[in-house]
From Swiss-Prot:
Glycan attachment residues as annotated in the record: 62, 105
Keyword Protease on entry: yes
GO cellular component: a single term: lysosome
Gene Ontology BP term (one): proteolysis involved in protein catabolic process
Species lineage: Eukaryota, Metazoa, Chordata, Craniata, Vertebrata
Keyword terms: Disulfide bond, Glycoprotein, Hydrolase, Lysosome, Protease, Signal, Thiol protease, Zymogen
Main location: other
PANTHER family associated with the record: CYSTEINE PROTEASE FAMILY C1-RELATED
One Gene Ontology MF term: cysteine-type endopeptidase activity
Transmembrane segments: none
Protein name: Cathepsin O
CDD domains xrefs: Peptidase_C1A
Tissue specificity note: Expressed in all tissues examined. High levels seen in the ovary, kidney and placenta while low levels seen in thymus and skeletal muscle.
């Protein structure tokens, strides 16, 4: 169905998005700007204009991304960025097999996705908490243990938000700082059921040393720009990859392959790569987000491989357990 043929439909969708999406998508958050129905309606109108513009570019490109109404359409871009894009960029060393750890020279299949191995947990929703950095790191730990043959468990993101030092909880953080904290302190991540997500900062809850949990043995952190085949080999060898991207245009993403409208060197959002697909004319990374399953492609984004789109290869981490 072409929504352009139904001029009233966008306004109905706005009402649904404004109160809908995932059940927890409107968790408590105190904005620094005044909120009102009038402001949200103005933001929605701006979103419609932005969608038309984005969709008018590169119309002949195969499988290009398409943009439209979703749960973020009632936010102005500056509001969206202030709430959701809170990952702090870090400078990663450029990967070199001669200097750094050697990645096995495995043969790359045309398609691979760790979800097919049943070692990736379900998409979560960070709500109005800028904790993407914690969600991506915890997701990688969950998968690393499952790949080793352990049961797939939802681990506590809230524990990382509350306890990780050199980070700011729901006000933003660094994946590198979180990984350093997990590794240096040999923190045992507990299950989400023991330390559930609250979508806000809280006091760190400590567990005894004898309490069962999931710790890491180490991690790697490299810049794989211009080396995305090596990055894919790391994915196959070590498990899902924690990456930091420029996700400003992801506010409007509905599906297709993201090839434009973002840049390298502007990292602001942490996500988890679970696989890749090279079977079509435009190869792409399969990227798990933390904005709920109603966003994008069932909570995932597809990002073009080979061109460092959105800076996806600039800041890449693997976790070892």
């Amino acid at each position: 169905m072409d929504v352009r043929a139904l001029p009233w439909l966008p306004w109905l969708l706005w009402l649904l998005c404004r109160g809908g999406g995932d059940a927890d998508s409107r968790a408590p958050f105190t904005p620094t700007w005044p909120r009102s129905r009038e402001r949200e309606a103005a933001a929605f109108r701006e979103s419609l204009n932005r969608h038309r513009y984005l969709n008018s570019l590169f119309p002949s490109e195969n499988s290009t991304a398409f943009y439209g109404i979703n749960q973020f359409s009632y936010l102005f871009p500056e509001e969206f960025k202030a709430i959701y894009l809170r990952s702090k960029p870090s400078k990663f060393p450029r990967y070199s097999a001669e200097v750094h750890m050697s990645i096995p020279n495995v043969s790359l299949p045309l398609r691979f996705d760790w979800r097919d191995k049943q070692v990736v947990t379900q998409v979560r929703n960070q709500q109005m908490c800028g904790g993407c950095w914690a969600f991506s790191v915890v997701g990688a730990v969950e998968s690393a243990y499952a790949i080793k043959g352990k049961p797939l468990e939802d681990l506590s993101v809230q524990q990382v938000i509350d306890c990780s030092y050199n980070n700011y909880g729901c006000n933003g953080g660094s994946t590198l700082n979180a990984l350093n904290w997990l590794n240096k302190m040999q923190v045992k991540l507990v299950k989400d059921s023991e330390y559930p997500f609250k979508a806000q900062n809280g006091l760190c809850h400590y567990f005894s040393g004898s309490h069962s949990g999931f710790s890491i043995k180490g991690y790697s952190a490299y810049d794989f720009s211009d080396q995305e085949d090596e990055m894919a080999k790391a994915l196959l060898t070590f498990g899902p990859l924690v990456v930091i991207v420029d996700a400003v245009s992801w506010q409007d993403y509905l599906g297709g392959i993201i090839q434009h409208h973002c840049s390298s060197g502007e990292a602001n959002h942490a996500v988890l790569i679970t696989g890749f697909d090279k079977t079509g004319s435009t190869p792409y990374w399969i990227v798990r987000n933390s904005w709920g399953s109603s966003w994008g492609v069932d909570g995932y984004a597809h990002v073009k491989m080979g061109s460092n789109v959105c800076g996806i290869a600039d800041s890449v981490s693997s976790i070892f357990v």
